[in-house]
Amino acid sequence: IWVGMISVVLFSACKTGTSRSLGEGNRGNPLPDRPNILWLVTEDMGAYISPFGDSSAVIPNLNRLAKEGVVYTNLYSTSGVCAPSRAAIATGMYPSSIGANHMRTSSYSEVTGLPKYEAVPGPDVKMVSELLRIHGYFTSNNYKEDYQFNAPVTAWDENGPYAHWRNRAEDQPFYSIFNFTTTHESGLFEPYGFRNIEMRHYHSGDTTYKWEPGNLTEEETPVHVSKDQEFEVPPYLPNTPIVQRDMWKLYNNISEMDNQVGAILAQLEEDGLLENTIIVFYGDHGGPLPREKRLIYDSGLNTPMIIRFPDSWRAGTTDDQLISFVDFAPTLLSLIGEKPLNYMQGQAFLGDYQAKEERKYIHGAADRFDEVTDAIRAVRDPQFKYIRNYRPNQGYYLPLAYREQIPTMQELLRLNEAGELNAIQAQWFRESKPKEELYDCLADPFELHNLADDPAYQDKLKDLSLEMDRWLTNIGDTPNLPEIDLIHRLWAGDKKPTTADPQINISNGKVAIESDTEGASIGYKLINAIGEQSASWSIYKKPINLKKGESIWVQAHRIGYNPSAIIKQNLN
């Protein structure tokens, strides 16, 4: 049973009648021809759960997923923060190759003096959710987006706090995402209390359920983990009562998120969909604590992933292959039997088009975060990580107002000012950085001992430096490029481009639509004679048959551009 706060639903499942293999290296495993795909995405999630060695949180649902699925130990985000990483997930491209690397593109302009802008991928790039819609899938997102660009109206069948696979057509396969924000770093702020909106997961899809703004009080917030427990603290943080309280909040938040995950999975079982659904749980980057989030050490990039496949395939096993967020989009296509698109910079790790060789490296980047800017790049193989600092005269720690609401961050600053941090804890506050860093991530998992100047490791340093050069050239990344120059490059000028209005042509009872903007997605809605319209926008693929008295709304949108106006035309 999946364990949730509101209800426990007993097992009920059905199986599809046809199947495919999960790809090379996965022979003998049946996969439904059109598998449903359910993503359970939590925020700011380091390896703080028992399938990854930490048993402090109470997570019966994730433990069941791990028992019935595959634990992936080496998943890495492309950035230590959400929006750039989510851009990689949505497109299959590295954020710094499409202008999505600064956090965020559309905020803090009053501090930076920069215009608001969006990432601008090439004209052939579509969100992977739109690609799945094109292939007949119902796609829903509940409900965070945050891609560094505004999603076109064609991206989702449903997007919002009530979005749910239950709203699809009968027997239509689905790709549904549920986002859980209880584990976000803001969940460590004081006063402590769960966000009311997150309680929607216990009523998922129920449009009659409403929630109050703001948070529960601490007295109202469920206690899943004892406040009296003594928690292990990472060596880069001081072990003080303030930090212990933040560790309790972290584990209590994870335990609450597990309950919410259980509520969604209970609905999946209730609908009889467990055995033709691929369930993927992962975090949007590493942990929420200082010296975790926003950094490109493993504490900021490495995040848990568990995948449960139909029919208990590889149940209870561990997979240590390197996986990057840019691999998600090609893998989604591969799992539904479609070839990944050429522009995608990742590779499929499952499905019909699984890459013949496992990934040899993962890559990461850190640039502007809110009001402060750095320029760091990283490459990691299964054992070693190489980091290149493009602003070595600038310290590691940068004063970020949002992060300084975390009591642990305030404690670090207080103890640093008083000279009471030990040598490891004080590393982050050095006023300059070496140009290069090299870490043995197996012997030194917290990346505290830089080997870049050690003669014994010069061959590895050179190898990873060459790999970084290859990667930067391949994706067109120019680290430390002034952000205003990046904006002008994306816009091909000093003004944000706007998608051309779609042109509607009616002939012989059919509507043909086109846009002069290369690569624009075109969405449309049909409105019948009494004004009824569909809830979602359809993707225009070919001329549309008309019905007498209908009218049509059309919008074109290339990712990163302003969308066109909505063109409305009566079809009488």
Where are these predicted regions, by residue range?
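Active-site segment of extracytoplasmic enzymes that catalyze sulfate/phosphate-ester chemistry
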Residues: 20-24, 39-41, 46-124, 131-137
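Catalytic-site neighborhoods of secreted/periplasmic enzymes
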Residues: 88-187, 356, 363
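A short aromatic-rich beta-strand->coil structural motif
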Residues: 37, 43, 332, 385-411, ...
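C-terminal cap/loop subdomain of S1 sulfatases and analogous C-terminal strand-loop tails that border
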Residues: 336-437, 472, 489-506
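Short, solvent-exposed turn/loop segments enriched in Gly/Ser/Thr/Pro and often Arg
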Residues: 51-58, 71-93, 101-107, 141-151, ...
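Short, compositionally stereotyped local motifs that mark structural "simplifiers"
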Residues: 3-6, 20, 452, 462-466, ...
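Active-site-proximal cap/lid insertion segments
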Residues: 19-23, 27-33, 47-56, 147, ...
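Polar, surface-exposed loop/tail segments
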Residues: 89, 144, 149-154, 274-277, ...
